[in-house]
Regions:
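Generic helix N-cap/helix-start motif at coil->alpha-helix transitions
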Residues: 122-127
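Residue-level recognition of tetratricopeptide repeat
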Residues: 157-158
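Catalytic core of nucleotide-sugar-dependent glycosyltransferases
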Residues: 84-92, 96-121, 141-154
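Conserved donor NDP-sugar-binding/catalytic core segment of glycosyltransferases
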Residues: 1-14
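Conserved nucleotide-sugar donor-binding catalytic segment
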Residues: 7, 17-101
């Protein structure tokens, strides 16, 4: 997995993925998707072994996240490099830029992989926290606040959520 430049309308951001430890199942579930589909090369057989990408309608925008989770369950080892070898163009109207749709898709992915309720609540809380941060970054403070509240309801012990609530 390599680094990328993310091109937005007004700025370019360098994004570096990894370290390898982030590709472990529990980290993927509790921290969210940390791998770019366009920044990875995997043997076709490995993808076929885990039943490829899901075509379920409810996880559109998070199909890659589901695939990474399935691959991590197989203890696949990824190599991460800090070299920037690609560019990702961000469009405001793209499917993956739709925060609420992507959050709901990620939630469906997580619910399909976690049975333990405590772990599930932590992972879902993180989904809403990520959504809140994205809304806040976009200047949508009301939506950010709502997302942080949903996050807090699922995990009262994450003190970072209280901080985000204060600033949103």
């Amino acid at each position: 997995c390599h680094g990328e430049y993310w091109n937005n309308e007004d700025k370019t951001t360098k994004v570096i993925y990894g370290p390898e430890d982030n590709f472990k199942l529990e980290k993927l579930l509790l921290r969210g998707n940390c791998i770019s589909l366009s920044a990875i090369v995997i043997k076709k057989e490995k993808i076929i072994d885990v039943d490829c990408f899901s075509t379920k309608q409810e996880i559109i925008t998070a199909e890659d996240y589901d695939l990474w989770i399935k691959l991590s369950k197989q203890n696949l080892k990824l190599h991460f490099t800090t070299k920037v070898l690609g560019t990702y163009q961000i469009h405001k109207n793209s499917e993956s830029s739709n925060i609420i749709r992507n959050t709901h898709a990620s939630i469906k992915v997580i619910e399909g992989h976690i049975k333990d309720q405590v772990l599930l609540n932590k992972a879902l809380s993180n989904c809403w926290k990520i959504a809140g941060k994205l809304y806040y970054k976009n200047g949508s403070n009301k939506d950010a606040f709502k997302s942080f509240m949903k996050s807090l309801r699922l995990n009262l012990y994450d003190i970072t959520i209280y901080f985000y609530l204060i600033i949103s």
